[in-house]
Amino acid sequence: MDEGIRQDLTAPTSTADGSTPLVSVIMPLYNAEAYVEAAIHSVLASSFRSLEVVVVDDGSTDGSAKVVETLAETDRRVRLLHQANAGPCRARNVAVAASRGRYILPVDADDLLAPSFIADAVAVLDQQPEVKVVRPTIDFIGERSGRWHLPDFSLRLLARRNHIAACALYRREDFDRVGGYCEEIKAREDWDFWISMLKHGGKVVRLPEVGYYYRVVAHSKRFRDRKLAAHVIRTLNIRHAAFFEQQLGGPLRRMRSWSRWINALTRPLRYRKTVTAEVAPPVKQFVEELPWRFASEGREIFKNRNAIRRFEVGEDTLVVKEFCLPHAFNRFVY
């Protein structure tokens, strides 16, 4: 484990009877002193007993970590690790790396889990190998009440918006296959993770019973910052260019619901075909992603009306030049 991670309890977590847990509940923790005890208790009250709770304190400045330390001293299923503040993606990746369960369940430190959800979700994954994700029906708590009405899963919809909450049970092998949570993206990390896991196939099952209680508080994140939204969309387009091409006919747009229409209208203006040698698949992927990667990656070698940038792709160094249309006067002269 990274040197920057500090673990309070050196012994690995185990179930109440000392066996290796089947389910690892991972919980990022940042300044949730008022809620984290109830969140952990809701997990420990689960009817499914073969579980562990791995909490990663993401540089909290309140008493959150102390609350978890006290719980860990009295229940061997709870373990606390510390890291410098690096965000929930890093915290989740660290938690999974320290965990031992076959199945992974993210739970936020200010939410609550229903007693029956884990048992019901494990039964689905055990019996249906084609299912990759089992999600709960969710109710709001805190400053909002009622049902969180999320639509049924479809890849086409997932390309435009995330409709799978963070709390959903999945297999460790799928986590490893996609490389965990992307630590480059600054928001909507769950959206990126579900795209990575599901874009090549797999079913999503939603259980009909309420299995999770999502807390809405005054500082709950919103996707309204324009720069943050642009960053998220740019990162998703870079990481999942082929997926968006398949589902939306082109990149995800700032007006996400209109992406297919915008792409259909602008298709005549876009490049038509990418041709690369079959022996160089990393280069092929790089070329397909160039429209979104050129302006924000690589090292600029030359800049005038056109720019030249250098990129490292695997073991290769590629030099790419962009060609912009000349200004109106130059077009007339030419």
Please provide the spans of the model-predicted regions.
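Short, acidic, metal-binding catalytic loop of nucleotide-sugar glycosyltransferases
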Residues: 41-50
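N-proximal low-complexity "stem/linker" segments adjacent to membrane-targeting elements
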Residues: 1-42
